[in-house]
From Swiss-Prot:
Residues 466-524 are annotated as: Disordered. Residues 149-274 are annotated as: HPPK. Catalyzes three sequential steps of tetrahydrofolate biosynthesis. InterPro entries: DHP_synth-like, DHP_synth_dom, Dihydropteroate_synth-like_sf, FolB_dom, GTP-CH-I_C/QueF, Hppk, Hppk_sf, Pterin-binding_dom. The gene is fol1. This is Folic acid synthesis protein FOL1. It holds the Pfam family FolB. Residues 335-657 are annotated as: DHPS. It comes from Dictyostelium discoideum (Social amoeba). Its cofactor is Mg(2+). Its EC number is 4.1.2.25, 2.7.6.3, 2.5.1.15.
Amino acid sequence: MDKIIIKDLLIQAVIGVNPGERIIKQNIIISVTAYKDLSKCGSSDNVIDTVSYSSLSKSICSYSESSHHYTLEALATGVAKICCLGFGIERVKVLVQKPGAIKLAKWPGVQIERTLDYFKSNSFVEIPSKLINNNKNSNNSNAGNNIVYLAFGSNLGDKFQNILNSFKRLEKQCFIQSTSFMYESSPQYYREQDSFYNCACKVSTDLKPHDLLKFIKQIENDMGRVETFRNGPRVIDIDIIYYNGLIIKTDDLEIPHPLMWERDFVLLPLSDIAPNFIHPTLHITTNRMKLNLPNGGNIHNIPPPPTATTTCNNIIEKVIRIGNLNYNWNDKTFIMGILNVTPDSFVDGGKFNTLEKSIQQATALIEQGADIIDIGGQSTYPGAQQISIEEEINRVVPTIKKIREVLGNDIPLSIDTLHHQVAKEAILAGCNIINDVSGEFRVPIILNHSQPTTQYLQQKQNEQYLNNSNDSNSNSSINTNGEDNNNNNNNNNNNNNNNNNNNNNNNNNDDNDNDNRSKIKQKIDLSSPKIETCTKLGLFRWQIILDPGLGFYKTYEQSIEILQRGKELMGLGFPVLIGPSRKGFIANTIANAEKDKSLPPPSPKSERRLWGTIACCCIGSMWGANIIRIHDIPEIRDAMLISDSVNKPQRRYQIQK
């Protein structure tokens, strides 16, 4: 067992029972000896597995200086609780001394010893602290600007819709500023019930704490919640987690929520929207509490909370609603089949641009294994004719309506468009997913699907094909800075072998901070403000899907880099879609790998591009891509069945023979 010693922290705090001691801060000296097994850190070299001396010291100081204890023992107990529950310390000794207590005493003090198991099994142990707003008649000086974090749960009926309905009712008195992802979690405290849907949201309100509690209880009652037994099933459950930074403890309300620290179904959603919010009594962030969960807050196989009676591990996973159906992102890699109702798309132009043929193809895509159909009415390859918005609507809307008529309402449909007018008409016709950031419709959207306008592509300075003249229909790789790509023509590669700027071995240098810098870094930098804009416009976090836009505004090396480092994009927490299907960067990667540099890149309809697409999809699946957008369903579906069996063994669906 490793020992961590923090000696003689000098702080000033309000402590004591006499009237004068409740006003003037006194010098307090705190020493801590903590015991924790850090062998895992030594073997993994992962700093998450160790204890930050600085963070622990700051938490102790912050807690002690802001709390108003009556006794040294109460303060020592509170410090011990922070060490154990906040930092995973297994055993701790806390010495608290008060030099100015009695003139003739040498430094009267109290020393206690506590364990992590003690606090887990005695969750009722109270940390005495300054109570704010501890009566129903409290006057809040921040009325109208109160920031509140709420947790939601439902496991009866249409669980997803129940939470959405509670949002609508909540908006009568609160403004929803942001939401977490939606999670599905196993029941923890009482196992014999259905799984829960959970999320969290940040709201602003002018309601005082007890008025807000009354309002929330009214929502629960109006939605049909019936009190049965503790931790039993419920139509809707809404808990106040934080209210500003207040500490409130009355007979009917306790803020912060007393058991939030052990609940993954609270901490994971809360960390989506308030990762750095500091718990006002534990004095640690939401992220720190999440990391203190067994398994470090990972979303699979989390051991049950300490106060639960079950020994079964908890499964908690992100879900999304598309149309009337709920999808679990970890079940499989979802396949989006491409349906272009255009005369000039680079792979299938003219094949499905009549209503009869488009319906036949949509039916075939579903039969072949597509989970989503992506419908496009405007080609974006270089040189494509730019059609009017009205013509694009006339191409896609009849197809959408006919698909709904023939195939029903359960098939998710996506509209691939640059124009919000087209997106609006497509949604009204029956689409479920759009590339629209207007927020007018609360449906899932795909962000960063970097499609340049046809006019942009047709500007001569931007026609930077990484293909030969016989491959004019392939997707282009475009450098948005208007600079030459490293490999504009594969036939010239042999002439540039000695040029370091064009050497393919140097293309993955992530330290170059030039105009041609890492596309992954650009995508992450650009995604965050777009995500923030979407949430401010009223979209829920679980409705956002990221697409790095393979092949658009990129050299082929940059598209390869995205495939190499896609896991970094996954680090944003959002589901990710990739669309490598038969694109030009695949052809150029193959051509550059050929010994005979005089060979032209494979054409869009070449089988070699199909094999390249399969490779890209398998790579994306390995780092966690959730959706793949493709033309060739049967071949890639089989590849994904194998890939998912390796990469997603926890999936719950059964592979059909």
